Swiss-Prot record:
It comes from Arabidopsis thaliana. Residues 443-458 have a biased composition (Polar residues). The gene is ORP3B. This is Oxysterol-binding protein-related protein 3B. Residues 47-66, 370-401, 431-458 are annotated as: Disordered. One of its GO terms (biological process) is lipid transport. One of its GO terms (molecular function) is lipid binding. Residues 375-396 have a biased composition (Basic and acidic residues). Expressed in roots, leaves, stems and flowers. Pfam families: Oxysterol_BP. Transmembrane segments: none annotated.
Length: 458
């Protein structure tokens, strides 16, 4: 029987390539259900230590970025939201933010875009899936950051021009619910994404459901790849050291041929066992395994051809397909070098849109270490956004994105239905005209302006 379910392949007995990993699966629940006792005022809250140490519970719970008085006050405020989707209903303090927006974070997928180039170039249909799925995994090093990116203002954008041959544009297309759309392109592929995060607040943790649709089109053969990622769990939001895990399946399907990749992100077990590990297979349209894949989402991925039982083919060996690039040491926000480039004006195009995330005053103030100013600017923009909403309602007007159009397509995801936005091509026309312009305005001098109504009094 072919191991169509990678979880079965991992835990299915003493044989099989992934059998040696079964011990980490058998410990599932030890760390994920371990509750550190001793929090008398906060009964029922879990403080999960991924290292599984026997530290004193109260000492462990006191770790993290919060001061005790801030922690107590925030917990009192948040109790009423337990079980709720808090994506946009809660105003959060700047102390938990990183100097980046969700639109910029979408662009981090482009760091290892050369893997999509390789997927387009190869003639091997299964190796194509290895390259493409490794690209999808590569961003998880960035996703482990425990700082929250800023929610984009409605109409906000982020653009990155010709970085390693890739042009990228994203736009906040809806505020309630918060939705972003992104498009990237080079000579080998196009990337299109509609994202609507859904959350569930659980007290000291939060589940983040990636309600969205991600499609990659490889240009040489017109192959369309569809990606469904696993959910993400953020542990120890208020008490303890915050950490992130993404247990579950990632599925990438070749909608043209029916081939697919099923990769299992193992949950963090006792003393950190299993954390970061990813295992699975590339299957053909008949669900027969063709290539096994294994690695860690924060380090590297490798692959090896396999037989119909998922066993490595004789005479073959594991080959590394992706490896994490060097990262800065002791970076406050765990940024990669690429993340710093995303935040910089070095990757900004000529005639940068005034709605660009780089220009946000709250983001920039936080980057400069001025939390007081960042908090003030954040509150001011949120109030301006509320005022714009009231004005639209009074005028009977709906917000219309500039670079993406809403379609009639509603796609089903494991976590709910999603309205799909598509790139309308107008940005390509704008960018071509801007690049041919003689305007050499310093982008740093541009004032942030995503607003629909320019003379609005808040």
């Amino acid at each position: 029987m072919a191991p169509n379910d990678p979880k079965k392949a991992v835990g299915g007995g003493g044989s099989g390539f992934f059998a040696s990993l079964a011990s980490s699966i058998s410990n599932l629940g030890s760390a994920m259900t371990k509750s550190v006792n001793g929090l008398v005022p906060y009964e029922g809250l879990e403080v999960i230590n991924p290292e599984g140490s026997t530290d004193d519970a109260e000492e462990e719970a006191s770790r993290g970025r919060w001061k005790q008085e801030d922690r107590d006050g925030y917990w009192k405020m948040m109790q009423k939201y337990i079980g709720s989707d808090v994506t946009s209903m809660v105003t959060l303090p700047v102390i938990i933010f990183e100097p980046m927006t969700m639109l910029q974070k979408m662009a981090e997928l482009m760091e290892y875009s050369h893997l999509l180039d390789m997927a387009d170039k190869t003639e091997d249909p299964y190796l194509r899936m290895v390259y493409a799925s490794s690209w999808a995994i590569s961003v998880y090093y960035a996703f482990q950051r425990t700082w929250k990116p800023f929610n984009p203002i409605l109409g906000e954008t982020y653009e990155m021009a010709n970085y390693n041959g890739v042009n990228f544009i994203s736009e906040q297309v809806s505020h309630h619910p918060p939705m972003s759309a992104g498009h990237a392109e080079n000579e080998h592929f196009t990337y299109d994404c509609t994202s609507k995060l859904k959350t569930k607040f659980l007290g000291n943790s939060i589940d983040v459901y990636p309600v969205g649709r991600t499609r990659v089109t490889l240009k040489r053969d017109g192959v369309v790849l569809d990606l469904v990622p696993p959910l993400t769990k953020v542990h120890n939001l208020i008490f303890g050291r915050t950490w992130v895990d993404s247990p579950g399946e990632m599925i990438m399907t070749n909608q043209t041929t029916g081939d697919k990749v099923v990769l299992y992100f193992q949950p963090c077990g006792w003393f950190g066992s299993g954390r970061y590990e990813v295992d699975g297979y590339v299957y053909n349209a008949s669900e027969e395994p063709k290539i096994l894949m294994t690695g860690k989402w924060n380090e590297s991925m490798s692959y090896q051809p396999c037989d119909g039982e998922g066993e490595p083919l004789p005479g073959t060996e594991l080959k590394e397909v992706w490896k994490l690039a060097d990262v800065p040491k002791d970076d406050k926000y765990q940024y990669t070098h690429f993340a710093h480039k995303i935040n910089s004006f070095d990757t900004a195009p000529k005639k940068l849109l005034p709605s660009d995330s780089r220009l946000r005053p709250d983001r920039y103030a936080l980057e400069m270490g001025d939390m007081s100013k960042s908090g003030y600017e954040k509150s001011s923009m949120e109030e301006r956004q509320r005022a714009e909403k009231r004005t639209r309602e009074e005028k009977g007007q709906a917000f219309t994105p500039k670079w993406f159009d809403v379609t009639e397509e509603v796609t089903a995801t494991p976590w709910g239905d999603l309205e799909v936005y598509q790139f309308n091509g107008k940005y390509s026309e704008h960018r071509a005209a801007a690049d041919n312009s003689e305007d050499n305005t310093d982008p740093k001098s541009i004032q942030f302006n995503p607003w629909q109504f320019q003379d609005l009094s808040t």
